[in-house]
Amino acid sequence: MDSDLSPQDKKDLDKFIKFFALKTVQVIVQARLGEKISTCSSSSPTGSDWFNLAIKDIPEVTHEAKKALAGQLPGIGRSMCVEISLKTSEGDSMELETWCLEMNEKCDKDIKVSYTVYNRLSLLLKSLLAITRVTPAYKLSRQQGHDYVILYRIYFGDVQLTGLGEGFQTVRVGIVGTPIGTITLSCAYRTNLALVSSRQFERTGPIMGIIIDHFVERPFTNMAHTHPCSYRAPGEDDGGTYAGIEDSQEVCTTSFSTSPPSQLYSSRLSYQTPPLGTVDLCHPTACTGAAHPHQMVVPGKDGGIPQVPAQPNHGTGAEQGRIPSCPTGQPPQLPPPTSCSSEVKTVSPSDVLETTFTRKVGAFVNKATTQVTTTGLDLPFAAFAPRSYDMEENDPMVHPPPSPIPSSPLQGSLHSNNSSHSGGQPNDDFVMVDFKPAFSKDDLLPMDLGTFYREFQNPPQLASLSIDVSAQSMAEDLDSLPEKLAVYEKNIDEFDAFVDTLQ
């Protein structure tokens, strides 16, 4: 297929595909770091600014991508995939999405490699920047912390979608035709985010206590003094890797410093569709009993039935939070790489208190006192305001001043009835303000805009169009008609002579 390409075009196309694959991995992984990325444009781009985009490469990600490619390029039958997964503090994992860069046999031999293919790959990369921030995994990555982390894995070969569970959806980011094939970039993401723990069928007590129903007593009250689990030891370097994780599966480096606990509680999984809410791991024996109006049973991938409550009820947040914990001296057990589970949402009591406090912050929580001084007000012209006043008694909007008496009957007739009586009613909805607008020509007729509009909207009827006047004039014409006809008959010869002159 590439026999028609010149050596230079073939070299350029291979280079474009190679760097596009590397930039694709960078965009996907950086979108799952859990933090917003802001880059500044530059008038003098450097050699690393491929496809006219200022994407700063992470060396570890580039190393993993090159190791996965192993000198190969995505081609026909050879796909490069980036798998995004979630791992909880208890060792449960769940695949979230798989991004696939592949090529099919459909060729576009008339396309120019140096300009057209390069520019279209740039547009496809920009589309990828947008699509990576609208899939469900983006919201999860923004909330990662001590409860779970987001992992990625790069592999080269056949696409593996079995770990996404049933009902996963696919989206095509875009396609770019080349002389050797059509490059296709697509994504398959999980829609069922219910978590099934690998240890939920054990007879030992659960590591974390979750409230199944806020109308029932709190279970596991002795768990309030436990501490959250963590993959990293306290003295471990930030640049280290998690224990038990393969070298090809990197951990986002900012997974533990991006979201405070209060944000984890308030906005966890807010991206989901209305029937799905935050996913909680329930007790094995309590999962069968079920359901509260704010909860929903969602079958897990392995047959489990986790509880999926909707949004937390106001006033019950302190009863629903628990700290994920693990037994002393026992490290978290890691499941096999092929096991799939979903995210566990837990919060500490301090998170609930902080969330409750932030909900009370507002402009209308406490009723303002009646007496207000100018020192407590943020007035733009505080120097011109009175020293002290009462809001209810002296407020001109509540008790408007009486309207001045019109200086002339004509001026008084132009005021509406509602405005003329506004001075005697302290609770009127309208306040009459007398002023002289620019469209009022004389000082004797100062009218507001509403009066001005109403006067011209309903003008008085013309006297010539009056019914009485028109009827009277018609009767007079009928009475004088015989006299006019007699005059015309008398002068008929003159009219005939005038008509002859016109011919």
UniProtKB/Swiss-Prot annotation:
Indicate what this protein is called per its UniProt record.
Autophagy-related protein 13
Per UniProt, what is one GO molecular function of this protein?
protein kinase regulator activity
Q: Mark out the compositionally biased spans (Pro residues).
A: 329-338, 398-407
| GO terms of biological process kind | mitophagy; piecemeal microautophagy of the nucleus; positive regulation of chondrocyte proliferation; protein localization to phagophore assembly site; regulation of autophagy; regulation of chondrocyte development
User: Gene3D superfamilies under this entry?
Assistant: HORMA domain
Which residue ranges does the record annotate as region Disordered?
A: 300-345, 392-428
Q: Which lineage ranks, top first, belong to the organism behind this chain?
A: Eukaryota, Metazoa, Chordata, Craniata, Vertebrata
Post-translation: what modifications? Answer: Phosphorylated under nutrient-rich conditions; dephosphorylated during starvation or following treatment with rapamycin.
Q: Which Pfam families does this one have?
A: ATG13
**Known function:** Autophagy factor required for autophagosome formation. Target of the TOR kinase signaling pathway that regulates autophagy through the control of the phosphorylation status of ATG13 and ULK1, and the regulation of the ATG13-ULK1-RB1CC1 complex.
Indicate, by first and last residue, each region the UniProt record lists as having compositional bias (Low complexity). 408-425
Localization recorded for this chain is: Cytoplasm, Cytosol; Preautophagosomal structure
Q: Provide the Gene Ontology terms for cellular component.
A: Atg1/ULK1 kinase complex; autophagosome; cytosol; phagophore assembly site
The UniProt keyword set, sorted, is: Autophagy, Cytoplasm
